[in-house]
């Protein structure tokens, strides 16, 4: 019989101790769905002169020519690139990374958000594999409903367009003026990703997270931890009324969760009017967001501390529910958010999913499993 455990999302915890995030490596994902370890060719560099804000930049310009590569990805949330990068790191060290949970930042953000959003707006449907004494978590691919006219929604497109308008593919000294000036006319696409691989932790739980990085704010240091140089880019409606302000506070709270998880220190928001014209740009320090929220909305300010405590609660719960003492044990689980709780259910051998999760490549690649098994062979 399947073992099930529930965790009430309003359960209170006391853990507020966070480990300093540290970047151990990085990789790129191409529009052709290829993964390249230690490749920063997809990394962007932030550059927006003040004068360009007077140009009435259109965040919906070129929407009809948008190239959507994501729809061709077999599995947008695959761990393949993350596992390749961890394996390359372990091959140098000749030992496995000492962490409890390996997943993407987006997965942990969703789990944190379950304490603040309903399942309707924050769907959590994960598959977990216990392998080699570690917990690997992956999101189940969700078939997005395509717009009837096949076009991307303007608010979604405006985010991609903003990134195109405020970044370049090389550091500024190596970028021509022509390239910079042609940014408004450049065709927008998705699928190019630069992912940082970060070791972090909360309480007694150590995590390895993959996190897509929007851009470098200033400069990149070779062979060093570059977390302090990264920036998160977002767009939203201009804040004109108290109602707008409340909506923005909710948005920046979610962005803060994204950034504090992996130690990204800066957030830049582009504010657009109702016609999707970029009106202003504002920079926020990730560390100062809780103070900003507390001064404007005390309840939301407290949510930042509550988010960290809840992060500690659900990771501790997972570690307690999933036995990790014997590295030879392999198990599979599903983790979902429904009503007011997270539900963890063990997937038994009789279920169709079990074989694919344990012996197939739904979560772990055969290459990674073979690598880990080779580490156990006495040299």
Curated annotation (Swiss-Prot):
Superkingdom classification of source: Eukaryota
Cofactor note: Divalent metal cation.
GO MF: enzyme regulator activity; metal ion binding; mRNA 5'-diphosphatase activity; nucleotide binding; phosphodiesterase decapping endonuclease activity; RNA binding
Record keywords, A-Z: Hydrolase, Metal-binding, mRNA processing, Nuclease, Nucleotide-binding, Nucleus, RNA-binding
Annotated localization: Nucleus
A single cellular component GO annotation: RNA polymerase II termination complex
Reactions catalysed: a 5'-end NAD(+)-phospho-ribonucleoside in mRNA + H2O = a 5'-end phospho-ribonucleoside in mRNA + NAD(+) + H(+); a 5'-end (N(7)-methyl 5'-triphosphoguanosine)-ribonucleoside-ribonucleotide in mRNA + H2O = a (N(7)-methyl 5'-triphosphoguanosine)-nucleoside + a 5'-end phospho-ribonucleoside in mRNA + H(+); a 5'-end triphospho-ribonucleoside in mRNA + H2O = a 5'-end phospho-ribonucleoside in mRNA + diphosphate + H(+)
InterPro entries assigned: RAI1, RAI1-like_fam
List of residues binding substrate: 212, 234, 258
EC number: 3.6.1.-
Pfam assignment, any one: RAI1
Cofactor(s) needed for function: a divalent metal cation
Top-level class of the enzyme under EC nomenclature: hydrolase
Gene Ontology biological-process annotations: cleavage in ITS2 between 5.8S rRNA and LSU-rRNA of tricistronic rRNA transcript (SSU-rRNA, 5.8S rRNA, LSU-rRNA); deadenylation-independent decapping of nuclear-transcribed mRNA; mRNA processing; NAD-cap decapping; nuclear polyadenylation-dependent rRNA catabolic process; positive regulation of termination of RNA polymerase II transcription; termination of RNA polymerase II transcription, poly(A)-coupled
Binding residues for a divalent metal cation: 163, 214, 232-233
Role played: Decapping enzyme for NAD-capped RNAs: specifically hydrolyzes the nicotinamide adenine dinucleotide (NAD) cap from a subset of RNAs by removing the entire NAD moiety from the 5'-end of an NAD-capped RNA. The NAD-cap is present at the 5'-end of some RNAs and snoRNAs. In contrast to the canonical 5'-end N7 methylguanosine (m7G) cap, the NAD cap promotes mRNA decay. Also acts as a non-canonical decapping enzyme that removes the entire cap structure of m7G capped or incompletely capped RNAs.
Subunit record text: Interacts with RAT1; the interaction is direct, stabilizes RAT1 protein structure and stimulates its exoribonuclease activity. The interaction also stimulates RAI1 pyrophosphohydrolase activity, probably by recruiting it to mRNA substrates.
The family this protein is said to belong to: Belongs to the DXO/Dom3Z family.
PANTHER family: DECAPPING AND EXORIBONUCLEASE PROTEIN, DOM-3 RELATED
Protein name per Swiss-Prot or TrEMBL: Decapping nuclease RAI1
Protein's organism: Vanderwaltozyma polyspora (strain ATCC 22028 / DSM 70294 / BCRC 21397 / CBS 2163 / NBRC 10782 / NRRL Y-8283 / UCD 57-17)
